[in-house]
Amino acid sequence: MTGLMAGAVMSIAASNAPVMAQEITVITPYLAQPGTQMFIEGFKAEATNMGWTPNVIDTAGDIAAVISRIEDAVTKQVDAIVINVDPAQIEAGLAVAKEAGIPVIGMDSGTSPLLVSNITSNGYAMAAETSVYVANRIEGKGKVVMFVFDAFPPVQIRGVVADAIFGNFPDIEVIDRVTPDVSDGGIADSRAKMEAILAANPEAGSIAAVWAAWDQPALGALQAIEDAGRGGEGIVIVGIDANPQARDAIAAGGNFEASVAQDFVGIGKMTAGVVARAIKGETIKESVIYVPTVLITSANVGQ
């Protein structure tokens, strides 16, 4: 009996022990984005606690290079790979990892049969909150500018939801659906594109709102509006992510009124937890795992 009890204790201890992985590779083309930086921060913190050696690779906007980096990781026989990119664009690399038996986990990436799971925020819900906020603030009428990025699934779905909501208000007109250059983060090009839109709509009050699928374009639009001296027109700006710059802008009480706080660090930590489960050989039933979010306005930005 004593031997059985000792064996049981050892079994429980083993199941709760850290997963000692030789190496985990994290690959992203979007490290210039503040949100991605926080994903990585959370992942690395949890990975270190588990005794892993996380290797973070930034391809600096080069999607094709992600495939090569996955192949390199497979050659090195890493224990797991984490991606932060549209899996549909890198299927060749994912197939190589699958063939090698190396689990690949998405960190705010998008879903794919070649992934164990994707850990992210609920983009549908976030877009619904911010687009409904805009519709209510402008009382269901006026011209709206949208900033989208359909090349990346977690952001693409936000635009789809906003399209549907604005389309349900007969007196709301989406006058432009802008896809900014995100190679430098997205603020500069969003600002330039918003400047052009303002120039094409010079009448005061001609633009009611700017809806952005993430904060960087919203911040760029804010700069353009303020520089044009049109901040007093009451143009409502919303974003998604609630990064520090966005929070500061919301707290300032100007045109940038709302964003959604994603738990970026929490997504990173949750991703590490799913990696641990995958390495142990556990079957992950959920193709998508959502981490909760919070709408941020002037009412709660200081909390």
Feature map (PLM): residue ranges:
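C-terminal segment of classical bacterial N-terminal signal peptides
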Residues: 4-18
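A residue-level marker of the well-folded mature domains of exported/periplasmic proteins
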Residues: 17-303
